[in-house]
UniProtKB/Swiss-Prot annotation:
InterPro entries: F-box-like_dom_sf, F-box_AtFBL13-like, F-box_dom, FBD, FBL60-like, LRR_dom_sf, LRR_FXL15/At3g58940/PEG3-like. It comes from the Eukaryota. Residues 6-54 form the F-box domain. This is Putative F-box protein At3g58860. It comes from Arabidopsis thaliana. Signal peptide: none annotated.
Length: 457
């Protein structure tokens, strides 16, 4: 950088320079600060630090084993923290792997905690579990904590208390037995909780919080007995796990959007039939509902228990070819205010219980359920161009009286019939005819590279 440009940067207001330095990775910000004394001075007060050992290491060159590079990284962190002294800090991010000294990591974390850090992101992928320092669990300044990989909370005692914490993200974090039940009461203003790759240590879990608004759970642990949701102000729920033995409490009266992705094995089918309805009834006030293929199958096990989703305006259903649509007729019937329907695939297994939603089996009263459905927009995803799909599209156009818009998105990852020369043109002509015959507007979307490949055949 020439001296003229350097002078221009140096004339910027201090707060602008500080913002620029904060937005850079700390290693780059430190390198930049040697350009001028003013920048070097301001770097000492940068309120955001981001350390990643990959900035120093080059695994593709086989250098991770070189202790000198790891020492260089650790010394760099030490120097930066020493340079900043006791100046306030807002954000601290640390992402390290095996070879970094855990004791030094402890000191770095305690350093920023003492300086009033509010946003903390810690991801340690060590060979052995790393225990987060006790000091984190009693921080009076933390607003956001994100941590994961080889991390546990064994050092956190029953006196944990995080009075300012609003966002907590835990990914593959290990709890001690009974420890999770003390976590939420220790976070009185928590609004967002993400439990990713969760391993439940307790058989019976109660998620209880009056402040929580957003909750995401992903787990394939399969060891949970009962799971309760006592979260009356929850607005968003994304739940992915094996079906629990029971859902005794489901207090979700203010829920707006929910995604249910259940994992089901053969030995849990009866459990799902008997116990999952407490969960489904608990989410009946939602306005947006995302349903995975397995969840859709679970709904078909006991359709008569399905509640009325009186507030539901958007329904997103993903299905697979190996499943039937047994739950579809009653599900649509029980959504009296449905406006938008997303279908992740039209192809499914033909059964005598598909009802009259599809045209799989000829029926005298074909389309009756659709005629009572108020939906005005349908989006079809994963369209493969089969004749059966085209017939299904015509069926929806014929029997959905309120339908104003249909969007068809062509499959991009799996094989389709469009590989057959001229087939895309034939399907497009057919859909164009449907568009002219119907009051519904049909929009057809295909990626440009695929379109050119198929039309050139």
């Amino acid at each position: 950088m020439d001296s003229e440009k350097m002078d221009l940067f140096s004339k910027l207001p201090d707060e602008v320079i500080s913002h620029i330095l904060s937005s850079l990775p700390t290693k780059e910000a430190a390198s930049t600060s040697v350009l001028a004394k003013k920048w070097r001075y301001l770097f000492a007060f940068v309120p955001s630090l981001d350390f990643n050992d990959s900035d120093f290491l080059h695994p593709q060159e086989g250098k991770r084993e070189k202790d000198g590079i790891l020492r260089s990284f650790m010394d760099f962190v030490d120097r930066v923290l020493a340079l900043q002294g006791a100046s306030p800090i807002k954000k601290f991010s640390l992402n390290v792997k095996t070879g970094v000294d855990p004791d030094r990591v402890d000191r770095w974390i305690c350093n920023v905690l003492q300086r009033g850090v509010s946003h903390l992101a810690l991801f340690m992928d060590f060979e052995e579990e790393y225990s987060l320092p006790y000091e984190i669990s009693v921080s009076k300044t933390l607003v956001e904590l994100k941590t994961g990989y080889g991390v546990d909370l064994y050092l956190w005692d029953d006196d944990m208390f995080l009075p300012m914490l609003k966002t907590l993200v835990l990914e593959s974090v290990e709890f001690g037995r009974g420890q999770f039940q003390t976590l939420l009461p220790a976070c009185p203003v928590l609004e967002e909780l993400m439990l990713l790759n969760m391993e439940w240590k307790d058989r019976n879990v109660i998620l209880s919080s009056s402040s929580l608004k957003n909750l995401k759970i992903t787990s394939e642990d399969g060891c949970l007995g009962t799971l309760s949701f006592d979260t009356p102000n929850l607005v968003f729920l994304d739940y992915y796990d094996y079906v629990a033995e029971d859902y005794p409490i489901v207090n979700l009266k203010n829920l707006v959007e929910v995604g249910i992705n259940l994992v089901l094995t053969a030995d849990r089918i009866n459990r799902a039939r008997d116990n999952v309805w407490n969960l489904i009834h608990g989410i009946q006030n939602a306005e947006i509902f995302h349903i995975s293929p397995v969840t859709f199958e679970v709904l078909s096990l006991s359709c008569e228990a399905m509640p009325v989703f009186k507030n539901l305006t958007t329904l997103n259903i993903r299905t697979v070819m190996q499943q039937g649509w047994q739950a579809m007729p009653l599900l649509l019937k029980n959504c009296p205010n449905l406006e938008t329907l997303y279908l992740g695939g039209l192809l499914h297994t033909v059964t005598n219980k598909c009802g009259d939603v599809c045209d799989c089996i000829p029926r005298k009263k074909k389309g009756r359920s659709l005629m009572a459905c108020p939906v005005n927009k349908i989006q079809i995803q994963g369209f493969r161009g089969t004749i059966r799909e085209v017939h299904m599209i015509k069926h929806f156009l014929d029997f959905c009286p309120s339908l104003k818009e249909m969007e068809i998105i062509v499959e991009t990852k799996e094989p389709t019939l469009f590989e057959i020369p001229k087939w895309l043109e034939i399907v497009e002509d057919t859909l164009m005819q449907y568009n002219e015959m119907s009051s519904c507007t049909i929009n057809y979307r295909v990626l440009a590279p695929l379109y050119w490949r198929w039309t050139r055949k």
